[in-house]
Amino acid sequence: NHPAVPMVGEGSGFIVSKDGIILTNAHVVDDAQKVTVKLTDRREFEAKVLGVDAKSDVAVLKIDAHDLPVVRLGDPRALQVGEWVVAIGSPFGFENSVTAGIVSAKGRTLPDDSFVPFIQTDVAVNPGNSGGPLFNLKGEVVGVNSQIYSRSGGYQGLSFAIPIDVAMNVGKQLQAGGHVTRGKLGVGIQDVDQALAESFGLDVPRGALVSSVEKGGPADKAGLKE
């Protein structure tokens, strides 16, 4: 028998308060026995994980430091498709690497994730970029780089960021109570395609079809039907 060798992972993050609150991705720190934060001035701190929310892929860390420089937050709702954005992170351990691209789409829902209206970009994101900030050209953080969509496992021009307002809301709830409370309607919906539109007598596909209603849920109590 051989002793287990500790696995070391890397990711990115950014400071949102002068007293050492840091945002990153949940998958960067989940199940970690020890988290070490290295700042751009090369100081290192052992971090405490204040909370992790896997559904939104957001985690909040705290380091014992004061008077730290903090990012400025922007409004992701003001982003326009085609607008330039910039990511900063440490892909493959190459610290403070900057990549740029454009906003490809807003409000994307991924197949395995229905809790975040992702910002889709073509910014190059690689292992180690996760949890790093996505900036607009005003130098404001508008998103948290989270994941890529790829058939090969490598970057193929599809990267996704959590809108910063979503991430900050999750972060505040994690700091306050260690968990996130979400509302729900209790319905399943699907897109209306051409075939469904014709069956309903619509001239063009539009709207959404209520495909299921959770028994006893808010929508059911309000009288919504399939």
Language model: regions and residue ranges:
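Serine-dependent protease modules
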Residues: 1-222
